[in-house]
């Protein structure tokens, strides 16, 4: 009898975990003694492989894109902007929905920027939690 409930419990646990990540103010990162978890570390790598060209080193902004450390949108808005792009006036950001180096890793990039915005992670390449 217990075996028939296991798949249901597993689905509920995964759904609950995803819902917790999407809850307003939920922390997607885990920093231990200044070291980043795998998701946050991967977000650092992905951010610095492309996003930093406009948003500056460590997400601090540049003349091309705003700081994402000083003013990080909520997760839903971040996903929407990264996928679809945004623009107003002379400032335009293309969408990355079809970019295989960005689209699958939007939440990882957000986790890194959230850790930076919260002051939980300093500048530069983070060490990884073992």
What is each of the regions a protein language model found here?
Residues 21-33, 37, 45, 94-130:
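Flexible coil segments in periplasmic/lumen-exposed cytochrome c-class electron-transfer proteins
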Residues 15-17:
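N-terminal signal peptide c-region/cleavage motif recognized by signal peptidases
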Residues 1-5:
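Positively charged n-region of N-terminal signal peptides that target proteins for export
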Residues 33, 37-40, 56-84, 92-95:
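Gly/Gly-Pro-rich "capping" loops immediately C-terminal to redox-active cysteine motifs
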Residues 48-57, 82, 93, 109-113:
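The canonical Cys-X-X-Cys-His
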Residues 8-11:
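Classic N-terminal secretory signal peptides
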């Amino acid at each position: 009898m217990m075996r028939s409930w296991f798949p249901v419990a597993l689905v509920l646990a995964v759904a609950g975990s995803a819902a917790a990540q999407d809850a307003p103010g939920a922390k997607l990162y885990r920093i231990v003694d200044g070291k980043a978890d795998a998701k946050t570390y991967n977000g650092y790598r992905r951010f610095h492989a492309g996003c930093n060209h406009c948003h500056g080193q460590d997400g601090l902004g540049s003349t091309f894109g705003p700081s994402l450390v000083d003013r990080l949108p909520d997760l839903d808005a971040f996903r929407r902007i990264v996928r679809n792009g945004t623009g107003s006036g002379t400032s335009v950001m293309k969408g990355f929905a079809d970019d295989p180096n960005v689209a699958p890793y939007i939440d990882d990039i957000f986790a890194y920027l959230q850790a930076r915005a919260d002051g939980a992670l300093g500048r530069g390449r983070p060490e990884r939690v073992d």
